[in-house]
Amino acid sequence: MSQFFEAATPVAIPTNNTNGGSSDAGSAATGGAPVVGTTAQPTINHRLLLSLKEAAKIIGTKGSTISRIRAANSVKIGISEKVPGCSDRILSCAGNVINVANAIGDIVDVLNKRNPENEDAAEGEAEEHYYFHFLNHILPAPSKDEIRDLQQLEDIGYVRLIVANSHISSIIGKAGATIKSLINKHGVKIVASKDFLPASDERIIEIQGFPGSITNVLIEISEIILSDVDVRFSTERSYFPHLKKSSGEPTSPSTSSNTRIELKIPELYVGAIIGRGMNRIKNLKTFTKTNIVVERKDDDDKDENFRKFIITSKFPKNVKLAESMLLKNLNTEIEKRENYKRKLEAAEGDATVVTERSDSASFLEEKEEPQKNHDNKEEQS
């Protein structure tokens, strides 16, 4: 029996949205409105692989479409620069988990919409075969047997979510249990690419379904990624849009054509610099357009109190910017902890003074009591 695509049922989330998330964000989710964002949600940064045409559609005339999505969902959203000879671009969307999921639901809805004045071009675009095979859909197009309302067939869309390989196994689950649960619960189709994106440790998770259903499944995927504590933040390389199809082995992020800087960060501050779920370091890499590798610690490592950060890029100014921002983050964290330590010491000092005063008062009371007894005896005599 064929699986039916299902309309999304909004997750019950409090609506005290002080982040500026708008209910308009859910208007795109045909087949069910996405949930409304809240300030209690942790943050995440999702990256999507786009073709050039998809990127142009999301940007819109003079950036109007992407600006609307950004404002409606209170997220940071951007698309990598268009490079001559490159067939793909990367969309990054950062913010709290629910707002990011809502924004991506809006993106799916934008990609689903066809220009009624140019139906032939839209049909050709849907059937386009890309030379860069990661842009070609892994999942087959939805059939009429997989949907209850044929009028909603065109509302089913896709996203190509870029995910670090270390998270893929958690999303799939033991014997595929987790991914099967997501598919059945949200009425979507999900598949992971077998191949790694060029020169990276990332793969594609393709999701097919209604925009609202994709929104809700992304919330659960985000929670899986954020709770995936057994991740080695390490040497995983992020994918950046290729210039040409690789003819051999993936190129190393530290080739001779790249500018390279190594920094030693105290082990005590590494977790804070990387951020929860590697969000902080990922945002830094995206903003500076660099590759940053955090080396794993070896048992025989002599510098056991430090971790090596390696920054590489083809552009020296980008490497310098990343180095400057990384050191600034380190100094901010050091200062933050020093301030906390001083406040803690001051509070302990105040507590000591109070204790000493209390002890002194008790001593004086004890000293005065015998004196009173002595005076009473003299009066009686």
Swiss-Prot record:
Transmembrane segments: none annotated. Residues 369-381 have a biased composition (Basic and acidic residues). GO terms for cellular component: chromosome, telomeric region; nucleus; P-body. Residues 43-107, 156-221, 258-326 form the KH domain. Signal peptide: none annotated. One of its GO terms (molecular function) is RNA binding. Residues 15-33 have a biased composition (Low complexity). GO terms for biological process: chromatin organization; mRNA transport; regulation of translation. SUPFAM superfamilies: Eukaryotic type KH-domain (KH-domain type I). RNA-binding protein involved in the correct localization of transcripts in the cell. RNA localization is a widespread mechanism for achieving localized protein synthesis. Required for the asymmetric localization to the daughter cell nucleus of the ASH1 transcript, coding for a specific repressor of transcription. Overexpression inhibits translation of the ASH1 transcript. Involved in the stability of transcripts, like the MTL1 mRNA. Involved in structural and functional organization of telomeric chromatin and regulates silencing at the HMR locus. Binds RNA. This is Heterogeneous nuclear rnp K-like protein 2. It comes from Saccharomyces cerevisiae (strain JAY291) (Baker's yeast).
